[in-house]
Amino acid sequence: MSKIVFIPLDERPCNYIYPDYIGRMSGLELSMPPKEMLGDFKKEADVEAVWEWTKGQVKGASHLVVSMDMLLYGGIVPSRLHHLPEAVCAKRLECLKEIKKLEPGIQIYGFQLITRAPARDGSGEEPDYYEDYGY
């Protein structure tokens, strides 16, 4: 049985629960961080805790499938709202090299969403200023 470490995009069921279901149906050992680490809507995940959790899970794993939005910014919505300096993001990205040192044979697959410009003026998933200055 292959062990896959999966870092989801965020805590929503389509990104957290469904992959777990698919893993179980497929007979894969799918390891995901506790949901509590992943933030909640506009509240970003505890990125450092997710990285530490990931480092502790990769031993013996064949693959790491990782949302770059999660591991760089703390989730999809926080990736749209962040004001992080480039140096912080670069430091977080360097953790992938550390993963490779911990488990040299692991295959790492990263994915990232492309930010969209919604055709509405709500601030629900967007920066608060969209309420007043949205599309």
Describe the predicted segments one by one.
Residues 1-135:
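An N-terminal assembly and electron-transfer interface module characteristic of large anaerobic redox
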